[in-house]
Swiss-Prot record:
Record PANTHER family: ACIREDUCTONE DIOXYGENASE, ACIREDUCTONE DIOXYGENASE 2
GO biological process, one term: methionine metabolic process
Listed name of the protein: Probable inactive acireductone dioxygenase 2
Coiled-coil zones: none
Classification via InterPro entries: ARD (IPR004313), ARD_euk (IPR027496), RmlC-like_jellyroll (IPR014710), RmlC_Cupin_sf (IPR011051)
Lineage: Eukaryota, Viridiplantae, Streptophyta, Embryophyta, Tracheophyta
SUPFAM superfamilies hit by this protein: RmlC-like cupins
GO CC annotation terms, alphabetical: cytoplasm; nucleus
Keywords: Cytoplasm, Nucleus
Function description: Probable inactive acireductone dioxygenase.
Pfam families: ARD (PF03079)
Family label: Belongs to the acireductone dioxygenase (ARD) family.
UniProt keyword Protein transport present: no
Localization per Swiss-Prot or TrEMBL: Cytoplasm; Nucleus
């Protein structure tokens, strides 16, 4: 991703364009799946993922100026670099956006999330989110147990979740047991 201060909703490709393979995201601890967003209520693959990973809570949110109260403030908060002490799981049912994640060299990688894409960011990973220029995403948020909404804005390197992430992923070059599709 480039270092431009232009509109955060733009793709921000480096020149020349550089695309990151799913294997690289997997090495950073990121999981991803392509699912059927048009029939998510009956999707057996989604049910299996939720059961296997213990995602017992879910809700759906629309992020757009017309539907999200305090839209501008929330978009600004989403784009503030932060980590969470639990996984961040998002399933795009409609629309699109970008998750920006830090690699092992502390450089940004921009991950496009589109309809049908499910992404899991590991606890302790610094990241941020923005919509793209379409200004709309309908996302399913999943949690293990009761939802924890607390973002810890950078720097919070002292938190156990961050220390574990750095030790497991950054210092060891990735989690080879991670499955990304």
């Amino acid at each position: 991703m480039d270092d431009s201060e232009e509109d955060q909703r733009l793709p921000h490709h480096r020149e020349p364009k550089e695309f990151i393979p799913l294997d690289k995201l997997s090495e950073l601890g990121i999981l991803s799946w392509r699912l059927n967003a048009d029939d998510w209520e009956n999707d057996e693959k989604l049910k299996k993922i939720r059961e296997a990973r213990g995602y017992s809570y879910m809700d759906i949110c629309d992020v757009c100026p017309e539907k999200l109260p305090n839209y501008e403030a929330k978009i600004k908060n989403f784009f503030e670099e932060h980590l969470r002490t639990d996984e961040e799981i998002r399933y795009c049912l409609e629309g699109s956006g970008y998750f920006d994640v830090r690699d092992e060299n502390d450089q940004w990688i921009r991950v496009a999330v589109k309809k049908g894409g499910m992404i899991v960011l590991p606890a302790g990973m610094y990241h941020r989110f923005t919509l793209d220029t379409d200004n709309y995403i309908k996302a399913m948020r999943l949690f293990v147990g009761e939802p924890v909404w607390t973002p810890y804005n950078r720097p919070h390197d002292h938190l156990p979740a961050r220390k574990e992430y750095v030790e497991k992923i950054i210092n060891r070059g990735g989690n080879q047991a991670v499955e990304a599709r």
